[in-house]
Amino acid sequence: MGTASIKLNKKTALFLATALMGLLSCAKNEAGENDFEPPKLTVLSPQEGQVFANGDTIHIVAEATDNAALHEYAWGIYDTAGVIVPSQFGLVHDEKRYTIRGSHVVGGIATTTLWTVWVHSDDERDNYDDYEINIIVSP
């Protein structure tokens, strides 16, 4: 059984991801009612410009911290055409610190190309932080 991919440009993909997170946020509690400080993301892996080949695993590791309470996170990998290679969303409630983890095995790459890893975290008041890392994938 094969996998399907959806071709979206990056702005459309980010809009859809944000809309999904907005829908998920309907169940938020009132924690952090006066919180105007966004979470802080520290991406530990991958590194900017890191090179991956077919068969390699891209490990996404990021630390999200917030002064009040984290709410959710997302990560995705986009190719140069804006196609989402993989992505993941998750809910994190009432935590001030959370380690975001994900992975993707590179496969089917015929020519060297640039991919973008996107990591996102928001808190209970919809304050957010986004981070992008460019990586190189090759056959």
Residue ranges and their predicted role:
Residues Y131-V137:
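C-terminal edge beta-strand
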Residues G22-S25:
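C-terminal motif of bacterial Sec signal peptides marking the signal peptidase cleavage site
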Residues D94-S103:
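Aromatic sugar-binding surface patches on proteins
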Residues Q50, I60-A68, S121-D123:
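Extracellular acidic, Ser/Thr/Pro-rich low-complexity tracts
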Residues V106-T113:
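Surface-exposed, short loops/turns at beta-strand junctions within beta-sandwich domains
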Residues N67-D79:
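Solvent-exposed loop/turn segments flanking beta-strands in beta-repeat/beta-sandwich domains
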Residues E30-L41:
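Proline/serine/threonine-rich low-complexity linkers at boundaries of modular beta-sandwich domains
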Residues G2-L14:
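Bacterial N-terminal signal peptides that target proteins for export
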